[in-house]
């Protein structure tokens, strides 16, 4: 059997590698690797999923998803964000990952370029390669709040550029892209006739009233921008595998044809759960309060550990911690921390070559476990 180079060239990601190592060690390991919260989804959402299964709603839906589920997403977008979105502008996918793959596969030809600001979620780069495109990484600096500048993006644009990926709030940094950076990217997209994919899966988790501007909502981006979102983070439903794209109808229609040949449709019980999640009876505010409390524990704890620094956490449930003062690279730090103190974090190198002096901490465990992890982290850096 001969396997393809396009797949053999995809190395296992560092987040998954550390996650797997933590599971293999087991015992009292505190796993802060994946963005997979331990808080349960709202009770009515769980009940809706169970009711769908009991009613044997376990077959196929339309390729783009149930009309009622797409309309539930559209209605939420209209009510929450004032967006002019109809069900026909929405396709439900197998998680946000499904949206990323299907969008890029629909938008780029082999040899086209995709601009990916870093630090980046690892899937953007790998999926671009899988589609035959060339990812062009633009590395943001910590002193700029991890927001790329207009000059950086402009310098990365070539005649082969087709797509710019925007991820705000950002994974892994937990930072929100500054408004001037958002407007600069929009201006460049218009000038060079580029499409922008806006990954907004953490939008519901912005803290302290920090201003948030979606590039999708700028009038000049109408028809040249899409949104990726999911129930995963907003409602703590990572295992339900239900994401979606909002975008121009030609893109949604193309993705629907692609989905027929890739996944058929998103899982039907999860679609019914999403209808409940976006319904008027759902209160997910407890999730926000829990993550906000954990964020404070992490921010206060990191700033009290010698050798570590943290610029800030605007949103999501990640802290991108600078470890430069320890003199260690990110992989040595992460592997050493796991071996010696049984705490699993992700090396910053996973999110771009420029970030080997960072680690990512996911505060997806209880406050008690976070405090224990911070104590072990202090012991590791001060030994």
Locate predicted features.
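A short acidic, glycine-rich active-site loop
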Residues: 57-60
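PLP-dependent class I/II
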Residues: 3, 8-9, 18, 22-30, ...
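Extracytoplasmic catalytic/substrate-binding loops of multi-pass membrane glycan-assembly enzymes
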Residues: 11-13
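Short beta-strand to alpha-helix junction loop
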Residues: 64-65
């Amino acid at each position: 059997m001969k396997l393809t180079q396009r797949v053999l060239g995809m190395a296992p990601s560092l987040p998954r590698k550390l996650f797997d190592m933590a599971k293999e060690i087991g015992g009292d390991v505190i796993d802060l690797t994946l963005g997979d919260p331990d808080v349960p989804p709202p009770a009515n959402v769980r009940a809706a999923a169970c009711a769908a299964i009991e009613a044997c709603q376990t077959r196929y839906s339309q390729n783009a998803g149930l009309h009622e589920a797409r309309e539930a997403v559209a209605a939420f977008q209209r009510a929450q964000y004032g967006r002019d979105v109809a069900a026909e502008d929405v396709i439900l996918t197998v998680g946000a990952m499904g949206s990323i793959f299907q969008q890029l596969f629909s938008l780029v030809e082999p040899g086209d370029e995709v601009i990916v600001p870093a630090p980046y979620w690892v899937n953007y780069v790998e999926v671009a390669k899988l589609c035959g495109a060339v990812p062009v990484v633009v590395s943001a600096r910590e002193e700029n709040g991890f927001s790329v500048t207009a000059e950086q993006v402009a310098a990365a644009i070539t005649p082969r550029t087709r797509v710019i990926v925007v991820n705000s709030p950002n994974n892994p940094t937990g930072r929100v892209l500054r408004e001037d950076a958002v407007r600069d990217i929009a201006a460049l997209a218009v000038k060079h006739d580029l499409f922008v994919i806006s990954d907004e899966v953490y939008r519901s988790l912005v803290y302290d009233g920090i201003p948030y501007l979606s590039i999708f909502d700028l009038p000049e981006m109408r028809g040249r921008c899409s949104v990726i979102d999911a129930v995963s983070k907003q409602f703590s439903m990572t295992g339900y595998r239900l994401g979606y794209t909002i975008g121009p109808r030609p893109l949604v229609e193309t993705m629907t044809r692609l989905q027929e040949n890739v996944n058929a449709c998103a899982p039907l019980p999860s679609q019914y759960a999403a209808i409940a999640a976006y319904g008027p009876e759902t209160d997910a505010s407890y999730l926000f309060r829990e993550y906000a409390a954990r964020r404070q524990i992490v921010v206060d704890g990191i700033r009290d550990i010698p050798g570590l620094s943290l610029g800030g956490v605007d949103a999501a449930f990640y802290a991108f911690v600078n470890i430069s003062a320890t003199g260690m690279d990110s992989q040595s730090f992460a592997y050493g921390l796991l071996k010696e103190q049984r705490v699993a974090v992700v090396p910053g190198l996973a999110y771009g070559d420029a970030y080997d002096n960072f680690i990512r901490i996911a505060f997806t465990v209880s406050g008690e476990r976070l405090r224990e992890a911070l104590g072990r982290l202090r012991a590791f850096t001060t030994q």
